[in-house]
Amino acid sequence: MSHPLNTRSLFTVALSVALAITATGLGAQSVEATKPMALRTVMEKLGRDMQAVTGAISKEEWALVAELAPKIAKHAEPPLSEKMRILGWLGTDAGKFRDCDGHVHDAATAMGDAAKRGDGQAVITAFSKTQQSCLACHQSFRQSFVEQFYGKR
């Protein structure tokens, strides 16, 4: 004997399917949102290079500082699609973000030039400016960036 589906049963089935689809979609979004962006890899490499410079300065290995400085000044950039997402999020602060990057570039370039001359004091001064530029950018953007692209932690 067959029973015709009543409206309530149909509604329950439709609602269950809709909730399952929505939950699956949200799960996929949260995984995508926590997937590391290319910028994270760039920042990790910059961190390693800055640590290597610190070690080289402590040993007065100016040739190594001269080798590392351009890697910091002309660091890799994320792919264009990621840059567009970041710039869209930055909005009117995009100029400030670019200025921070420009300051890092200029200070790291000066550090490399000083290292080539063997001018330890100038290397340390330029390294300090490089580090201060990194810190200014991180203090201005890191927390809100992480919240925007990785969720609150």
Set out the residue ranges of the language-model regions.
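Sequence context surrounding c-type heme c attachment/ligation sites in exported
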Residues: 29-153
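Bacterial N-terminal signal peptides that target proteins for export
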Residues: 2-14
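Bacterial N-terminal signal peptides
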Residues: 12-22
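Intrinsically disordered, low-complexity basic tails and flexible linkers associated
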Residues: 24-27
